[in-house]
Amino acid sequence: MQKSGIFILNKPSNISTYQLINQVKKKLNIKKVGHCGTLDLLATGVVICLVNNATKISDYLLNANKAYQVKIKLFTLTDSFDAEGNIIQTQTPFNISLDQINKVISKYNNYTYNQYPPIYSSIKVDGKKLYEYALTNQNVEIKSRKVTIYKTSLLSYDQKNYEIFLDVKCSKGTYIRSLAVDICKDLNTIGYVVYLNRTLSGNFKLENAIDLNNISWDHLISINDAIRTNDFKVVKYQNSLEIIQGKKIILNDINDDLVFISDDQNNILAVYQKYDNNIFKIKRGGLNNDIY
């Protein structure tokens, strides 16, 4: 029997998220794995690995906000917006004051805008990923996506090496590489990401993340704890058999459209969605079953 739950992984640089998850699967002989959002090849930090039935809650954890530390190199631009790409533009360095940087940074606080993702990304257009268009030199229309930058803080400014180091808290779907380019545009220059580290995914923190070499089943976080850690609405329901059978249920005084249902022992059994007034219907069941 295998348990279900999540691992908080600390992804190293120069390995894809897919490779990382696959290595966890092989190392622990896990039957079913998934993840809650990719990181760029060169990026490091928090990756949520879903194990067995926890893959059923991927959409909910994927919607969580994120936090990053990012270092931006000014006066040079690459086609991928990071150090992995080819240099496509350079600019003669000029003086950018600390006040100018702080003024631009202050714009990106509780700031919602339409962001264009990089061409080298996994977003699909007409069934193909954007980077596939780039690799074959095909033209494709890149559509913007609405994102929110909740807070941007300047950690340091290295004027000698033309590097800005930022801490960013943002909504799901934000491309930090695109944000870096947008910030540089506001500074009337160009730039690309030379360092990116995800420090937070939902309420899962980097300091609690496990390196691949040290991972064991002891580090598994249960589905119950994963859901409660991220402050989802959890409602206790007396008749757990109705939940197991996937029946519609009545929940009074619930304003949320989506709730997790637990039994008397606080085991989360399913996700329910509001159907009509106080009637809820099952959206995802079988969350508390282990895999045999």
UniProtKB/Swiss-Prot annotation:
EC category: isomerase
Superkingdom of origin organism: Bacteria
Molecular function, one GO term: tRNA pseudouridine(55) synthase activity
Record's keyword terms, sorted: Isomerase, tRNA processing
Pfam families for this protein: TruB_N
Enzyme Commission (EC) number: 5.4.99.25
Main function: Responsible for synthesis of pseudouridine from uracil-55 in the psi GC loop of transfer RNAs.
PANTHER family: PSEUDOURIDYLATE SYNTHASE TRUB1, TRNA-PSEUDOURIDINE SYNTHASE
Protein name, per record: tRNA pseudouridine synthase B
Source organism of the structure: Mycoplasma mycoides subsp. mycoides SC (strain CCUG 32753 / NCTC 10114 / PG1)
Gene behind the chain: truB
